[in-house]
Amino acid sequence: MTAPEIGCAEAIPLSKSQQNLYNGVLQDNDPALYLIGKRYRFHPLALSNFLAALEASVLNNPVQLCVLQMAATDADYPQLVPRLQFSDLVLVRSAAQGQPDGPGADLEHTWSSGILDRPLVRYTVSTDEGGNVCGLDVHTHHILLDGGATGIIEADLAHFLAASLEPAGVGQMPTLSQGLAKLAAAHLRETAKVAEALRRQADAVQRELTAEAGQGGGAQGASGTSGAAAKGVLQESIALCGPAYDALRALSEAQQVPLNVLVAAAAVAVQAGLRQSTESLLVHAVDNRFGDPELNVATCLVNSVAHALRFRPFASVREVVRDLDRGYVKAVRRRWIREEHYRRMYLAINRTSHVQALTLNFIRESCAPGLRPFLSEAPVATEIGPIEGTTVACVLDEQRHTLNLAIWDRADLPERNTGAGVAARIGAALESMAALWDQPIAMTANEWFEVGADGLPCRTEAAGRPRPPSAPAWFVDAAPGLRQFLDRRRHVYPWVGWLVCHGVVPGDVLVCTDDDTDKTVDLLLACHLAGCGYSMCESVDDLSLRATTIGEHCEGSSAHPVDVAAVRLGAVPDHALRERIDQRLDQVARDPLLATKAAYIMPTSGTTGQPKLVRISHGSLAAFCAAIGPSYGWNSRDTILQCAPLTSDISVEEIFGAAVCGAELVRSAAMKTGDLGGLARDIHALGPTVVDLPTAVWHLLCEDGDAVDVIGRSRLRQIVIGGESIRTSTVDKWVNSPVLAPISLVSSYGPTEATVVATHLPIVYDGIAAAAHTRLRVGLPMAPNTVFIAFGEVVIAGPLVSDGYLGIDDSSFGAVAPGDGSQLRAFATADRVTIDEEGFPVFAGRKDTIVKVAGKRVDTAAVARRISADPTVCDVAVEPHDGRLGVWFETERTREAAEDGATAGRIGLTLASLGVPAFFVVAVPSIPRKPNGKVDGARLHTLPQLADAVPSDAEAGESAAGLARVWSRHLGRPLAADSSLLGAGIGSLDLIRILPDTRRYLGRHLSVLELISADTAANLVCDLGSNPAAPATDGWLDAETAAAIERDLVSLGSQCTPQPLGAKPPPHDRAAAPIVVLGASGIVGTGFARAVLERKQAGLACPEIVLASRSKPPEHGPWSALRGLEGIRIEQLGATLGAADLDALICDTGARSLINCIGNTNVLVPYRGLRAANVELVSTVAQVCAQRDVRLVHLSTFVISADVTAPRVTDPRMSPYPYAASKSLAELIVAASSPALDFTIVRLPRVLGEDYQLRESADILVSVVDACMALRAFPTLTLTEEVTTGRAAAQAILGLLPQFSGAAGLGHGITVVRGAAVQYRELLSGYALDEIDAAEWKHRLDQSDWARRNPQRWSVVDAWVSLGMRLGARSYSQYLAGYPSIPLQVGTVAEIAAPPTALRALLEQGCAQPPRPALA
């Protein structure tokens, strides 16, 4: 081939898609992240013909011959410049050779120091034994090509392959200049289309997102997902074919729904089951070339469109498919709005930097049709580049009647359970859709359960079961005790007469207030007997509005305000009135529509928002009342205390429950006034046997010693509580009290929308308490076949469910189909559940208690539960306030108006461990509550203690204005504190550029996603509001990470039950037994390789050394000399290293000592990216070594403790950054291992590797020296750090092992390796550099070419400077001293010396950038 005419080729600007990807490259450190790969297997083809066709296809798509080069001017982005030949892209090898690291590994290595001036595509051609082509692996950087471009190249390759079989062969090669001209034109057109879309559609999209955010729509924040991309790895795949494929096609045609939408619906259902949430953000990959021939060019033009989807947990398949289809069509209409712009709007409007999205990539053909005849099997995607979350890749093969589903996920996630079967579950959901089209979509994902009579969930074949008709009202066909109950109520029948005389007809509604006497209760009873309903108001001022509302929205009903106190009732109705009363009672009992008429209209509690009026029918109330006696055991010998406000639905249970059971009913007004002492006295004086209380009130009573004493002397036999979670500690206090234990306790649950109570759970019975872990269970249904669980949310269906809110159309209400053609009313409660170890559902908070705090989602219910677990806390309230989370708490000390700083401090630490980004803690004498037991939020926010706890707005405003000035200077345009970065047109690259100055100004390390989500200086200052109660964790410790660390702290430290071992290793003298160095290819591992080589070369005694690593050792450094050396084994491990693999290695080698050098040292990645190597593997290694009686040398680091000689580690829940947390956990795991394990934990200072390792590393010391030499200046700083080399550390550590030292063992202790103390200022001044202010140095660095050429090293230096800002004048040890620590159960702590040699020369070698050879 003739090389391109370099001098004639013009540089081509990047497309908008490529610019976005380049922004990502600048932020990410993994060269493999953007690798795209596809594998083809061919029928045998002549190599010469194949290469000729491949060369022609490359020339026809010349973007592949381009490299990225920065323009001579100070441009934002590099340009595409043709500088390569075909031979630079192609590698031919025999298929028998194989490549241990994969065919794309060499390309990844090429990109390790950056992607500028590097080939971005590699064709690896495989040949069979006969020399014919049998396979092709294509790897490219995503910035060069997308999926559509791959299809174009495939079509060209097919064309030229077909031509190569003709006598004339491929013929004239395509002209390079024409291809480059088409490429440039396509990029210009794409840029124009994007600009036009922004001009025409951006405002509409912003309004749409704002509306969705206001309605609570959109995806949940992925507290565990940083928003940064990670390498995608294939998890699993399946193929739908044969009858399953045909049935799916038939469904698509019958319902007129595209196949990709059906797949999306199935994926959404399965994902909803996995996440236990019905809110999703769906992202669809789109190829904008469609329909535009000018864009039909091989390059990267990829875009994605996103749309939010929120569906009811009981929604049918039909409903979800319909909504998803509409959302997809709407999203595709704005396909030219760039995904990164849409994301910026989404993050800014939703004030979050974390988005959990499901990506769907539906590909309508596995390859270009013309290529199929040459292929022996369908091509396979081997690498898909960066992804942010679960990605469902679906490939349609119409020719083979097959639909292939593949699940890809982030490589940095913990190892997935092999039984996850996500692809299989999606396939099963697709197969079941036709039969379940009108059933809940939860059933397709096996997420629909009915809670049975025993409280256990079970799957059902239909959404519900039709119930036999029940009584139309609670007083129709009632038990004999009802008559006696009514006869005891002296005002009931006079009230019925009054209603008759005043023209109140059946179906009307009485609106009134409570006069705190039996007279009002009797009116409510009389209303029902007369076929009417009632609605209670808090005050007389509310009567008129309530009556008007009911009149407007209750068709066929009239509302009648009544002044109860003013009505004068006769003692006994006369004969004529009695006849009219009897006629009315008979008329009502015979009314065929009685069950549908309103029994009461009651406001919701308002706990989760503005109270809404709920209409409950007589039929619903009758179904509930019929369940009270069997569920609670109430009977005619009971006396029920009516103490709840009549505006609360607890009063419904008290009044009508007593009526149907024939019990006595007595009243107390103490609850209404909040007089708990008075309530206790009434319980004693009035003699009730049963009382119904809000859980919060019961908690407070239990904390009141006087009240407990009074209640203990009463006739009480049962308390029914409900309204919020029960505290286990309070239950224990109850059963441990001799006077309270005999009183049974029943916890009830139910929303106002489903007639008072749906389930009940016995907590204390006969003085015995239910086990602690069972006390938050959902419980037993009041009525059979009414309680369901769908996607982790409680759904109530059947007669208990109301028709909905008065005058409000709410999606929580709907209907499900039992399968017999009928419909059952359904209500989605928003109450979340999990399943405990015994299979019972357990309450896990509410969906609507999740609030946004500083852009992050916080579950206030979970926070309240954690704080309530503190035994000193009597009461607590948790609510958002001015962008922060407020916690008001009450203890015995605060009740006496005393300070309780200890409790406040513990609460602050709890909030920090839960990842709450901004909060304040307020100690109060008492938590204000409403009569129904709910927290009175209005009074809470006016408590005088709040002013002292919350910082003033003036300081925050000044800080925001200062930050806006910093941005204005940097961007060259005026910005105010409330100016939107998005609205001002600040691009992604500009955001990356202002990030360093923003970090410096705020003194905090933050990500570009946090900057995007804040969008204004004012928001950002508010989001990063300080939490003085706890050490800052730099924003990395989100709720999910905190939970993961908590789990690891509890579970990984305790060794699992040993698994059965295989054959024992061959016997060895322990003093001369082999040593395994695990992770030998890393910096310290290579140090061991160098140290062992030098011992061998010096003729010193050395036991057999096994150098084991997952990656292939390089061909330079000590490795080439070690190969074939006697007593040295080099073992390459598999990609995953489990207990069985490690056990096999030990058995095979006969090792008696193991040095664990494996570890992820990247200080920039999140905890989940470190966990596998730094935590999980450490646990595995410790267990296997203990089981095999193998000594363990565990390598650790200085960053885990303020004092490296102390047997303590910083509490990983409070560590300053993820890497430190993971290393602290690792030490805790080793120290807590089996007593049989002989170990030492070796704490290392900074360790430098071989020269070739340093040249490719992003070590902070090397990076700082490199940056200083590039700038010819170093920052003024006083920093001293211990440093050693891998070789020196290895030599010192080997001396610890009995094979070298002759000692009996390692000693179950800690060994501190001491290096040389390096003063940064002294070191850097030795390079003849200028010393300048640190801020000025960092500013120069951020603007430098070095920063653009070395994004990885710049990121590390940037994080280092950010940490320095947090340290201030303190050393790192002094900084860590402010963090809580955990002691290690170890023996002695010893120190060994490992001084490095020629440190300055080594650093210079690491910084030296040899000239890159010019590319032809």
From Swiss-Prot:
Domain comment in the entry: Contains 4 domains: a C (condensation) domain, an A (adenylation) domain, a T (thiolation) domain, and an R (reduction) domain. The T domain acts as a lyine-specific peptidyl-carrier protein, and carries a lyine residue that is transferred to it by the A domain. The C domain catalyzes the condensation of two isonitrile-containing moieties to both amino groups of the lysine bound to the T domain, a rare activity in nonribosomal peptide biosynthesis. Finally, the R domain catalyzes a four-electron thioester reduction, releasing the product from the NRPS and forming a terminal alcohol product.
Catalytic reaction(s) noted: 2 a (3R)-3-isocyanyl-fatty acyl-[ACP] + L-lysine + ATP + 2 NADPH = an isonitrile lipopeptide + 2 holo-[ACP] + AMP + diphosphate + 2 NADP(+)
Annotated keywords: ATP-binding, Coiled coil, Ligase, Nucleotide-binding, Phosphopantetheine, Phosphoprotein, Transferase
Protein name: Isonitrile lipopeptide synthase
Cell cycle listed as a keyword: no
Needed cofactors: pantetheine 4'-phosphate
Function: Nonribosomal peptide synthetase (NRPS) involved in the biosynthesis of a unique class of isonitrile lipopeptides (INLPs) that seem to play a role in metal acquisition in M.marinum. Catalyzes the final step in the pathway, i.e. the condensation of a (3R)-3-isocyanyl-fatty acyl-[ACP] to both amino groups of a lysine, producing isonitrile lipopeptides.
Occurrences of domain Carrier (ranges): 965-1028
Modification sites for O-(pantetheine 4'-phosphoryl)serine: S988
Record lineage: Bacteria, Bacillati, Actinomycetota, Actinomycetes, Mycobacteriales
UniProt entry tagged with the keyword ATP-binding: yes
Coiled-coil segments on the chain, per record: 188-215
A matching Pfam family: Epimerase
GO cellular component: cytosol
GO biological process terms held by the UniProt record: amino acid activation for nonribosomal peptide biosynthetic process; secondary metabolite biosynthetic process
EC number annotated for this UniProt entry: 2.3.1.-, 6.2.1.-
Sequence similarity: Belongs to the ATP-dependent AMP-binding enzyme family.
A GO molecular-function descriptor: phosphopantetheine binding
Disruption phenotype: Deletion of the gene cluster mmaABCDE causes a significant decrease in the intracellular accumulation of zinc in Sauton's medium where metal concentrations are relatively low.
PROSITE patterns documented for this protein: AMP_BINDING (PS00455)
